């Protein structure tokens, strides 16, 4: 899993908004297309070689690169079809932005809470999180390895909803938007909440994402505390590849 961008809310210098490239030896999926992530994507895979795009929700920092990608696919690369999985609200927002249908090239499939899709050899399961708009956390599994992604959420959701058999996760990328003193003020997580949530989900590795600029060190220390994750915590740094 390669981090294309992990900035919360707005792009930071050198760090686009949310975007991840999830790959197996035979499959490549772009997970969330936040502002600025198309350029980094092309450093790792050609747009024509993508098997699908998965979008967690309609907030701009997670999806608004797609109108640019639509134009590039139609008018530059001449790509006829790219499968896209996302919420109905995301599709409607993007249709309004482009002023018309998304297809071609985006062959859109609406997904919602409880949906499952298979892309190549990677399975994707979706669970609606605690966020003001329909937002889907993601469980991606291939070859016996499991990756979890919180997208945006508050505390009234848990990774166990993606893992009913309690098998755990090899890697979780979890948002940690809020400073500790703002706990509960928005439907986002503090680093302590993220750490505790991922410990309860039996995550073997945790990487924090969706943070504001310059707070990463403090957030990691909060998440590593005994009452949180209780072990080493990483950050989703742009350009870094996690092997799951």
Regions found by a protein language model. Name each.
Residues 156-243:
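Cap/insert and terminal regions of metallo-dependent hydrolase folds
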Residues 26-29, 80-83, 146-147, 204-205:
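Short active-site oxyanion
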Residues 30-34, 51-61, 87, 148-153, ...:
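Active-site neighborhood of phospho(di)ester-bond hydrolases with catalytic His/Asp-centered motifs
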Residues 79-135, 142-143:
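Metallo-beta-lactamase
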Residues 19-22, 136-140, 242:
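Short beta-strand scaffold segments in enzyme catalytic cores
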Residues 9-58, 64-74, 155-164:
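Pre-active-site segment of Zn-dependent metallo-hydrolases
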Residues 11-15, 115-180:
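Active-site-proximal loop/helix segment associated with metal-binding centers of metalloenzymes
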Residues 65-73, 96, 216-225:
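Metal-dependent catalytic neighborhoods of phosphoester/phosphodiester hydrolases
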């Amino acid at each position: 899993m390669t981090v294309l961008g992990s900035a919360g809310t707005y792009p930071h210098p050198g760090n686009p908004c949310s975007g991840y490239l999830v790959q197996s030896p035979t499959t490549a999926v772009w997970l969330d297309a936040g502002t600025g992530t198309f350029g980094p994507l092309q450093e790792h895979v050609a747009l024509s070689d993508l098997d699908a795009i998965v979008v967690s929700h309609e907030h701009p920092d997670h999806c608004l690169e797609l109108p640019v990608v639509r134009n590039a696919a139609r008018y530059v690369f001449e790509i006829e079809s790219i499968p896209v999985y996302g919420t109905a609200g995301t599709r409607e927002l993007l249709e309004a932005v482009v002023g018309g249908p998304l297809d071609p090239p985006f062959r859109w499939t609406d997904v919602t809470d409880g949906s499952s899709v298979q892309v190549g050899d990677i399975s994707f399961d979706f669970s609606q999180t605690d966020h003001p708009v329909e937002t889907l956390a993601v469980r991606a599994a291939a070859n016996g390895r499991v990756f979890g992604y919180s997208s945006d959420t508050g505390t009234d959701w848990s990774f166990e909803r993606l893992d009913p058999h309690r098998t755990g996760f090899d890697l979780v990328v979890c948002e940690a938007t809020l400073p500790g003193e703002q706990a509960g003020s928005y439907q986002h997580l503090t680093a302590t909440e993220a750490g505790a949530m991922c410990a309860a989900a039996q995550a073997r590795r945790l990487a924090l994402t969706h943070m504001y600029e310059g707070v990463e060190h403090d957030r990691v220390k909060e998440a590593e505390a005994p009452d949180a994750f209780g072990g080493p915590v990483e950050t989703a740094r742009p350009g870094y590849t996690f092997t799951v």
